[in-house]
């Protein structure tokens, strides 16, 4: 959750530790749009252009063109999305290894992290960096049962049964 940013809860996982089971859990229980936060250097190395030249998103979320890894089938299954995320983590991956557009939505974090932009993209990449992992994380907004955004304390109730914590 960000205090001055989007004021919503996201589930976050490290890209280096992704599994199909974790993707399935997140999409089932968080229910929002699954995205992949990445550092700018990864976006540049993989030649992932911004989705739109002039970003008019009020929060400044930096979506790139969507991607699927070249070995995936439809791209949408938890297995295919985990495969794509693992490929984004791989330092040997090349731009031609990805189909564009795809079913995974990379978001580019600001270099200054949460000090530059107080968003879930930057928070998740910062967490990956602090863990000594590649600057790749997967995130998903937490929705209420009725489909509206879960705000605190609602999102805490959604994650509490699973032993997940809150980081502000």
Language-model segments: which ranges?
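Catalytic domains of riboflavin
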Residues: 1-167
